[in-house]
Amino acid sequence: MADSLKMAGLSLEDSQHAPSHATGRAPYIPPHLRGQQRAGPTMPVDGAAPQGRPPMNPGSWGPNGAPPNNWAPRGANNINGAPAWGAAGGGGARFDPNAYGHPGHRGGQSHGGAGSGAARGSGDGQWRDGKHIPGPPNARLERELFGVPNDPSKQHTGINFANYDDIPVEASGHDVPEPVTTFTNPPLDDHLISNIKLATYKTPTPVQKYSIPIVMGGRDLMACAQTGSGKTGGFLFPILSQAFKNGPSAVPTQNANQFSYGRQRKAYPTSLILAPTRELVSQIYDEARKFAYRSWVRPCVVYGGADIGSQLRQIERGCDLLVATPGRLVDLIERGRISLCNIKYLVLDEADRMLDMGFEPQIRRIVEGEDMPPVNGRQTLMFSATFPRDIQMLARDFLKDYVFLSVGRVGSTSENITQKVEYVEDADKRSVLLDILHTHGTGLTLIFVETKRMADSLSEFLINQNFPATAIHGDRTQRERERALEYFRNGRCPILVATAVAARGLDIPNVTHVVNYDLPTDIDDYVHRIGRTGRAGNTGLSTAFFNRGNRGVVRDLIELLKEAHQEVPAFLENIAREGSGYGGRGGGRGGGRGRGANATRDMRRMGGGGPPMSGTPSYSGGYGGGANNYGGSYSSAPSYGGYGGGYGGGSYGNPSGPTGPSSWW
């Protein structure tokens, strides 16, 4: 074989990459070092064949390929948050597996190999020596988060915000803080105010005017505000502002030694936001990224229907503010990847919809069955467009000494929305819809149907009629739904056909027209559907197709139209007088889940009898046993009486509580 190689001009004794030595053999050069040897000394060899793994570059590695003693991990890189190894240079922080990814152990550390490098967080800010140090501006990220002027995919302040000063606001509870009128310090942090300015928000909405001082003052809150009124900012602004001022929390010592494969295995968020749908949690997460820009706070989002591996990797890089759907959060808790022991803020957004969708067992497990601090050890905020009586009664288990906030005619509809109701038989709906689209062809149009099959069928029909349309419903994959929403937002497909999955909470900017192709069977769903337009102070148009198949909601619909000062068609009045239309879900106005005139009222002040009140009076006849005595222990279910007349007039006592039977309402 050697002879044949020599015939070809090759030799087993020759090397094409290094000079020959006296022994006649050339040293082995690892592929990653070839071409670099001329710049440094030749690696010594003893003439014997290399044994074991080849030696590494002596200028970079210590004995046996191990890092030398002066090496320390640099801070998280900008790609995936993993440690980047490099020379410490005498000033770098030593690697501490107990601190990696734990925000509570970052104080006083320099997030870099030699006192430099980017810090962990959504905006590359730092918390160092008890101070919040914002990161440098990032033009590309700013364009991604905040858009550019006149960006159609971003919602900006509406033209009717000036009229919000005339909207009535009801705040019940003792010692309600005075509302704020501008985004200033105090009470907000300067860095948050700078991000609010980047978002071109100039004036707080009514819910924000009250929620900011309430949450900053340490109170629990139940907020009932009109759809599109800025509820997301109502809880994000005070939570992030407190985080920027107070810094991260330390991880409990019993959990500080959890470290696996160079990463923190379990996340310890300080804020938890629960919402019912994938679209809503994604929307809240996007807003959190926006207002946490250049800060030390790192938001994360988890939801079902998406790759759990990528979500786990996101959490492992650090998670200070977690936005989640209840089901996926329970899954991650069971996997041991998330602990709730550090939670300071719990937010339930669209709380009534979460219960409607059957999430109550998961919510109770998250709040009461895991390691989340008890009601007195955290702040709890509930936000939604409606809070029927049973939801308010549920609040007794989750909230303490809370302020009930009702802004405007919530549970009704916004006057910013012009509502039209047309009598259309089922067979004529498609032709009438085409007429409407030809008449109101500009802007984004959102069409609601009742079934997934109808969503696909109607979108295909519109495409065949040369209308650019797309559809979204529960059977579509998460990627298909996200793509459809993106095409709709940027105007590529200005017509979106949707089932109820997109009706609640989605903040789709600049929707000018909502069409209820199929009316829902519950009036609350109608309220939330048409609330997709007329958001953030802008005006909008709503058209509903009505026929006798919808007579179950006729009385509720008439009342809503009157409350919003809209025209009531004569055919609605006629059908209502026929006597067959009284009800809706639950068999009548105020039936079902308790909607009606009291759906936006503080149930602590509603009448109803029950045992006499007890405890020290604090507001309108007694709050019921003092601020800290309502509710009971988490070890047994509370026994409760009627909710009585007056604030604290009824009894929601729990014999297992600290002072015996105490009054709830």
Curated annotation (Swiss-Prot):
The keyword Isomerase does not apply. Gene3D superfamilies: P-loop containing nucleotide triphosphate hydrolases. The keyword Lipoprotein does not apply. It comes from the Eukaryota. Residues 106-124, 580-595 have a biased composition (Gly residues). It is found in: Cytoplasm. Residues 416-576 form the Helicase C-terminal domain. Residues 58-86, 653-665 have a biased composition (Low complexity). Residues 212-405 form the Helicase ATP-binding domain. Its EC number is 3.6.4.13. A motif (Q motif) lies at residues 181-209. It is an enzyme of class 3 (hydrolase). GO terms for molecular function: ATP binding; ATP hydrolysis activity; RNA binding; RNA helicase activity; translation initiation factor activity. Keywords: ATP-binding, Cytoplasm, Helicase, Hydrolase, Initiation factor, Nucleotide-binding, Protein biosynthesis, RNA-binding. PROSITE patterns: DEAD_ATP_HELICASE (PS00039), HELICASE_ATP_BIND_1 (PS51192), HELICASE_CTER (PS51194), Q_MOTIF (PS51195). The Q motif is unique to and characteristic of the DEAD box family of RNA helicases and controls ATP binding and hydrolysis. ATP-binding RNA helicase involved in translation initiation. Remodels RNA in response to ADP and ATP concentrations by facilitating disruption, but also formation of RNA duplexes. This is ATP-dependent RNA helicase DED1. It comes from Coccidioides immitis (strain RS). The lineage of its organism: Eukaryota, Fungi, Dikarya, Ascomycota, Pezizomycotina.
